[in-house]
Amino acid sequence: MSNKMWGGRFTSAPDAIMEEINASIGFDQRLYAQDIAGSKAHAKMLAAQGIVAAQDADRIAEGLDTILSEIEAGNFTFKRELEDIHMNVESRLAELIGASAGRLHTARSRNDQVATDFRLYVRDTLDALDAQLADLQRALAEKALAHAATVMPGFTHLQTAQPVTFGHHLMAYVEMVARDRGRLADARKRLNECPLGSAALAGTSFPIDRDATAKALGFDRPTANSLDAVSDRDFVMETLSAASICAVHLSRFAEEVVIWTSPSFALVKLSDKFTTGSSIMPQKRNPDAAELVRAKAGRIIGALTGILVVMKGLPLAYAKDMQEDKEGAFDAFSALSLVVAASAGMVRDIVPDEKRMEKAAGQGYSTATDLADWLVRALNIPFREAHHITGRIVGLASDRGIALHKLSLDDMQGVDARITQDVFSVLSVVRSVRSRVSYGGTAPTRVRTQAKRWLKKLGVPA
């Protein structure tokens, strides 16, 4: 005889392997707080609608509060044979308050229950991530403001391209994280509809008040279609998509930290707080925090891929496949939280080698574009012609193994007689960055303005 809560029509217990593959309590116990909150709101609504007696609803609420305290104190025993968080909570509720516990599941299915729990959990996760990302932006903007005029090489193809400032480079990530926060906020807006009351798939014949439960749980409204409500996992996929893009951004930053801290570049230093040593090479200082930020992006992207593949072939409405929606998501959310925290820590810890940065910024003829721009402005030469002239001058300097500013005026006039002594005023990396005053440019004045604007927006006093 089956003793499962769903076992009325079953005459024997499930096989041990069936219990093992069917159970989700090993991971969905994370939903305990959301499950209890949803059940309390549901019980209160049932009483308000006269579907259950007020005293039963009160006993249910008291019992659920006791269970919450037990779980948070570590005194609750989760049982695999009860499958999931819903049955574990309901079983314990029955032990605490007796028959009244059986009233709780009136007008409700585990299908709408888990959909509600998971939305609440993802919403809580989104709120926590947004706060973390705002802190990362503060760290970036503060460091950018401090280094608005610190010259460093800007790269394309990982080859020195033009001088920029360290502050400008960091502010690029402030903008990326702003888009990440926007995507996560958009996901939260679409998530914030309440499935509770959709029951298994078709709704319920009981006179429930779905608006009341939606409001009690902080949702904007109840979901409009019961089939969609119990079979929808868009909110997980969308959140994981935004999380994956965010992880890619932070992976790119981490890759740069790995490169910059390499002795071959030596542009920045991380302290002992965010590096580790080698078990055999005593001189090593390894940027493990950055490397793990980079690696965890793969786990987060993997979770997105996993749920997309799980959901791609499911007919409406619920199928047990959807139990696989949580474990990867939980892992990805935890990973992203750690990635954001580690990134903020590294930003605050990182110290640029300003002299080496400025020297590196001048390598690779990085002011060649400034030379071409000067030819256009000062001599009214069309840019394409100026580009060609500059290329010849760079070739001359390269052949001699010297920097552009080491060429003589005669050398340059040998390429084009129109060039004057004023050309040397634009060949300094410091002058180069100061000249990039267009909106969004690397000029220190622009970087300071942008950093201060963001810090004000993020609530940091001037």
From Swiss-Prot:
The keyword Amino-acid biosynthesis applies. GO terms for molecular function: argininosuccinate lyase activity. Its EC number is 4.3.2.1. Belongs to the lyase 1 family. Argininosuccinate lyase subfamily. This is Argininosuccinate lyase. It catalyses: 2-(N(omega)-L-arginino)succinate = fumarate + L-arginine. InterPro entries: Arg_succ_lyase_C (IPR029419), Argininosuccinate_lyase (IPR009049), Fumarase/histidase_N (IPR024083), Fumarate_lyase_CS (IPR020557), Fumarate_lyase_fam (IPR000362), Fumarate_lyase_N (IPR022761), L-Aspartase-like (IPR008948). The keyword Hydrolase does not apply. SUPFAM superfamilies: L-aspartase-like (SSF48557). The gene is argH. GO terms for biological process: arginine biosynthetic process via ornithine; L-arginine biosynthetic process. It holds the Pfam family ASL_C2. Disulfide bonds: none annotated. GO terms for cellular component: cytosol. Pathway: Amino-acid biosynthesis; L-arginine biosynthesis; L-arginine from L-ornithine and carbamoyl phosphate: step 3/3. It is found in: Cytoplasm. Signal peptide: none annotated.
